């Protein structure tokens, strides 16, 4: 990463971590801190933007009349991971883009799936969904930049 001399590093994490039932808050905090510290050391000129994971769902299976039925339930740990990332960002004075909230919060993975933006696994976006996410992040960055320019110009 250092060879690229980035001015901005977007660090998206939390989705996979939210599926771990053994990962503690302290362990997650240490993992985030290890990555951020390494990036700060290797790329001191870069600003770091953390993003929270969107809501996702866990796959469940039940038997109904001897047939297996698959259904999905919201992954409740996403909220915990989201809060941990947001807290870390505040404590370390990092920007944080709250993808969980922006994507629609609780219940949004079903809506994204219906719109064709969330993959069948209810965890990952489709190609179109990732394009939408990228466009939303781009707009948020450009809006924040314009607000900064306007403040500096005053």
Protein language model annotation of sequence segments:
Residues 56-154:
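Catalytic His-Asp segment of secreted/periplasmic serine-dependent ester chemistry enzymes
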Residues 1-29, 55-56:
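Oxyanion-hole/transition-state-stabilizing segment in secreted/luminal serine hydrolases
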Residues 27-31, 77-80:
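Short, glycine/acidic-rich beta->alpha junctions
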Residues 7-12, 47-52, 95-99:
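Structural recognition of the beta-strand scaffold that forms the well-ordered cores
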Residues 39-44, 144-147:
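Secondary-structure transition/capping motifs at alpha-helix termini
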Residues 1-5, 34-42:
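Short amphipathic alpha-helices and their capping/turn segments at secondary-structure boundaries
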Residues 20-21, 47-51, 59-62, 107-108:
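Extended hydrophobic-aromatic, low-complexity segments
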Residues 32-37, 82, 86:
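Generic structural signal for well-ordered alpha-helices
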